[in-house]
Amino acid sequence: MDIKELTEAMHNFVHSKGWYEPDSKRPQTPRNLAISLSLEANEALEHFQWQGELKDKDELASELADVTLYLLQLASVSGIDLEQAILKKLETNASREWNTESDDSSRRVSGKG
C-alpha cells in the first residue's frame, strides 16, 4: 500500500466508528489529532525507558502504527499532501549543512524547518 491507500483505509476505519460525525465523542479535529499523535509517540518512547534494548518489537510496531495512522489523518484533515511534504523535506535536508563538530550532530548549522 502507498500513502494514499493507507490514508483511505484509515478514513474508512474512522468513518466506520462514527468519529467523523458532528456529535462524536472523539472529534477528529487537527488539534485533537496532533495531541493524539504526540501521546502515541510518547507511548513508543516507553519501550526504551530505563532499558538499553528493545524488549517487545511487536508492541513497538503497534505503537509506531498508531503514530503513523494519526500522522496520516492529521495531514489529510489539514489538507496536506504528506507524500509531497516528505519529498520536499528530503530535498531540503539534502541541501542543508549539518553540524558534525558537536556532540549533537543532528543540529543544523543554518536554515529553518
Name each model-derived stretch.
Residues 1-64, 68-113:
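Flexible "arm" and connector segments at domain edges
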